[in-house]
Amino acid sequence: MDAVKKPSKAYRAVKAIAEWQKTVWYPVLFAVAGFAAASFGWQAYVPLFYVMAVFVVLSALFCDDIKVMLVPVFLAYFSIGSDGALDTTGHLLSTWNTAGLVNMIIAGSVMGIAFIARFVRDGLVRDVFTRRGMLSFGFVLLLGAFLLNGVGSRYWQPLDLAMGLLEGASLALFYVVVLAVSNHTKGLCAYVCRLCLICGLMICAESWLLIGRLGAAGELFWPENGILKRDNITLGWGVANIISGTLVVLIAPTMYLTYTSRYSVFSYISAVAMFVTTFALNSRNAMLMGSIILVVSIIICLFGKNKTINRLTTLSLFCAAALVVIVTFSVIGFDSLPAFFGRLLRTSDADSGRFGLWQSGLRDYAGAPVFGTGFMHGAEVTPDYNAFSRFYHNMIVELLGATGTVGVLAFLVHIKGVFEICIRKFRVERLLIGLGVAAVIMASMLDNFYFYINMQLFYGSFLALAEVQLEETRAALLASHKRVEAGRKPRVVFTFVEAGMGHIVPEQAICDAFEKKYGNVTEVVRSRFYAETEDEHMKRFERGFVDAVKLQSRSRIFGKLCILGTKLAGNALSQQFVMKMRYPDSKADGRAMRHLRELNADVLFTTHWATAFYANKLSAKDGNRPYTVMFCPDAYSNGMFDIDCNDFLIPTKVGLAKAQHRRMYAGGRGTVVPYPIRGEAFALRGKKYELRRAAGIGDDEFVVLLADGGYGMAKLERTVEELLALKADLRIIAVCGKNEKGAERLRAKKPSAPTRLDVYGYADNMLQLVCMSDVFVGKSGANSMAEPTFFGMPIIITKCITPIESGIKKYYTKIVGNAMYIPDPAKAARTLADMAAHREKAEPYIYRARWCAGEYGADKVADLIYSRVVEITDAPPSDEYKVISYE
């Protein structure tokens, strides 16, 4: 047998480099090269950028950890070198040697191509477009507002569109990139924070070397007043304000490592070094905002697992700083303190022209309050050096002046999501990452930082990290459910919540199936969660759900407003509002939590998100957090179902795909299950004519069944009236549910031959009525669509009360194909009359119902629930699961 050929030495060397790139020394070496490239002209930055490009290509081809590709993302920009002082007054290209600039662009392009190629290869580009984050909606709104900047203003120009696209896309770019990377790696938060620390130290080194050079050349201070020549402090990628602003943004993620890492002293000193460098750069904005960020970060780090060493480090640094101040002013004299602070704060240039810029921005907003005057118009009190020189140097004024009310509203929706990520299931580590986001916003109150790509890099990345950390927290909480001790029957609680019968009916079917199959090995509890306590607050709360459904039945606008409110406020805030903020309904919250503890569920099953909301509030320390299984009966879930649960079940593949696209149910399993139709439905299959004869209905009659859910409050009456007016040869069965007045009005009508009319109120034999009918007509409720489809019936949908029901309508009309959407009662009646006269027209819909719908039945759902019971049981609850030893 031929020997297996060993890899060549070159290949082994390349693989060794790829493995080395996964260590912290790769970004350290990259930063050292970046420091040299940024500091020593084209003779350094040209070869070093090509070396960086080689390393990026190697990592793209051979490294198996995708997060390594973030090294050039965070460090390459701050490695840009120059051959002269950065010129921002309209002659930007004069900063570089032409050949050097061209080569730097080529090397940078190689890095970019390698990065994109790796993203495509690993499927991250697909993730960007198929997995939506919590902030995606807000970023899309901002992009739309930025694209519309200046529309309708007399100052608008095509460049405004280009600038809006650039700003909106770059603002969201790094958020989606880092979020996509998180799907393919682990330990991302700590890794990115280490990159921030390394980047900050690299910038500090670049800054201090530049300051030293300027000092040696006598170009650091003005000789007449000793004030720093800040215009001379420029690197290839930024002026003093931008350099110092970047350092401020990097303080918080560096302090994240101080809070979490065992090398906390090093990261602590590094953060202080970044802050001290802002003083050396003499940026008042950075000194002010950096002080706030650093002090808050220090206070946070005085607690937690590293609190002892962090407190000692704080005390040591405070003493060292005090000693330096005392010695320094002992030498130069304490009487020089006022003059020193005057030079440091540049009191002679108090506002640096900011007030005039802000007044100009507010005037522009007053003249174009809807979409603003556009990014390219800008303040009229500054020279037009470059695209940013006429920005208003305050992000709120910039949003007002350039994008108008539309931009501000989009930002408010976005920032609401930012707050939600930072405070939802609060963790201190996430707060430190959020402080990095806050640093960008705070620093942008006195500058244009929010609109600079280097700041957008960190802004988007930190938001993605905060979301990743939130998902990790949610997953950890889900994993903290209680287990079933050996020798005890697992307690499975089915909670019934009335918010339309579409939640009740499928849960009854699942509970019946589970109790029949596994009732002997588990303790099954049927809980009418709100009603059984006899607590008036609990009863009123459930009535609120019912009333909301009825109101949505009467007013489609109300339903759309509910969904719009959820989109704008976000899922978590919407849930909090419904469950805890509506007085007096909010009084039910405490009693509901107590009742959930009283139920003492090992496994909690629900078809309504309310009880899952309560279960999700129980902590691991509570010792009573159940394993939660939630079934959404709709074709597509909505934001209110975005409750963390251990198992999320839905009856359609498209519904699960959409839920996963929205990154819902972090940490929980998502499963497509058969629709849990009631068990007696299977016994009725094939008995259509037997049931008809028992009801006195002829075999050849064309029977139309109309029902509008449990409350009967859609278009049933109008459709019946239109059918009666046509005098078609058919039988109408109208089921009015709990709408007793509607039933009375229909019973009072006298149909003319050959039309027959049977009117029911709330029908306990609904499945029999469905089975004996030829076509179903009504609103697109989950159960209302599933049962006729099970019996192979065509469906005419006359109303979609909410966007949820619009999704159900879409599923049955477009995917299953057995339904038609005819919202006009008169047209629906004509279609039914035509179908009664030409019954062959129903055949395609019958075929689609029989062959294109998914599976049905509650047994598989019951089996899934029991499999979860076995998973969380320390000793399986049945002899059937005993482990046999063959030793």
Language model feature labels by segment:
Residues A252, L294, L432-A443, F449-A479:
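Transmembrane alpha-helices of multi-pass inner-membrane enzymes
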Residues L345-T403:
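Long extracytoplasmic/lumenal interhelical loops at the membrane interface
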Residues L147, S170, C189-L220, G236-F303, ...:
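Alpha-helical transmembrane segments of multi-pass inner-membrane proteins
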Residues L228-I233, I309-L315, I326-S360, E380-P383:
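Flexible juxtamembrane loops connecting transmembrane helices in multi-pass membrane enzymes
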Residues I697-M772:
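Donor-nucleotide binding loops and adjacent catalytic segments primarily
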Residues A18-F119, L148, V440:
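N-terminal signal-anchor transmembrane segment
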Residues G100-S109, G133-F146, W156-A180, L195, ...:
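Aromatic-anchored transmembrane helix interface
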Residues T403-I441:
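Hydrophobic transmembrane alpha-helices and their immediate junctions
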